[in-house]
Amino acid sequence: MTLADLRTQADELDRNDSLAHLRDRFCIPRHTDGADVAYLCGNSLGLAPTAARECVEQELVAWEQLGVEGHFKHERPWVSFHELFAKHLAEIVGAKPYEVVAMNTLTVNLHLMLTSFYRPTHERFKVLVGHAAFPSDRYALASQIELRGHNPEEAILTAKPLAASRVLRTEDVVALIEQHASELALVLMDGVNYYTGERIDIAAITEAAHRHGIVAGFDLAHAAGNVPLALHDWNADFAVWCHYKYLNGGPGCVAGCFVHERHGFAREPRARMAGWWGHDKHSRFKMGPDFEPIPGAEGWQLSNPPLFSLAALLPSLELFAEAGMDRLRAKSEALTGFLELAIRGLFPEWGEVITPAEPARRGCQLSIRVTRDAKRAFVALVANGVICDWREPDVIRLAPVPLYNRFADIVRCVEVLSCAK
């Protein structure tokens, strides 16, 4: 394969892309040369939908014109504004609308879920996590363990790849569950790992955990909006995710949470950290002293959600509904496969792709461990308008996103690498 061959293939693929028009619905940053950048960083922060500004401004105008009455007299009343998101989020994560809610931020939601679902006993107090869990997850988990009077060093069990592999296999996680079942209170895994890009089998891990009465929860920060999910059918107990990566809600925007209906509608409500926005909607404003949770995931809400953050998220979710996860996933597999083909074919000595090669075991991201002059290659990419990110000590992450990336973006990335290697 040559660069010329790659350009020809990319041109053909872009011409035949049935989702190409969606790119025009996003604000693409410009490079210093005036051209669009090749933005391969949607795994860190998604781009702004062109409609986001107008959607936020509509709510600003409503605030200016209505004041507090916007909660009830607005065309989209603020008191129920978050309910607009349930159907969209349910489709994206594979849930019932009442099993999902947009609220808080990811780590806050994780704390709320751990408060309700991590119920250690003297015998079963350990938590199984993945080898490269995002640090905030480990911080939250360790603090929850300490609050229960246990030692995190003893209570956290880490699933690590086999010596010959850099990624974690689902079967290895299942084997650890079987081995430590009598000690485990919770399995907490990433749907897609932020560092390696590896994807685990949520259904298989949940089934293995439930065989032994172990709770199964998931961090979907790098999975929601990236890969198809079926949380309800897979019987996951809970899940949390952010909306600022693949779901394009803006930096630090409101996050998402899933609670399976068997918990959200249990006859005896699960213990939780409670707040007034999770109280029964029909009696919330009676300001009674006793908490009555809304059935479903909404019952874990604390305060009324940040309205402007929600407004910025809505246009992206509408684009997901328009495109459909199946079509987006098909394009995603094609983009990432094209990127991998180019990297392996043109630069076999440049670096090691540590993300699994099988499409079913990854999302859109490729993580490349660069074997020499890694930082120089990264600096060259960014300097030439290829926006990606760096993870210590030597990994470059590239994530072509089907909503707004073209195959031509991958060609630009490869062209820069050909000059920098």
Predicted regions and their residues:
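Pyridoxal 5′-phosphate
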Residues: M1-K421
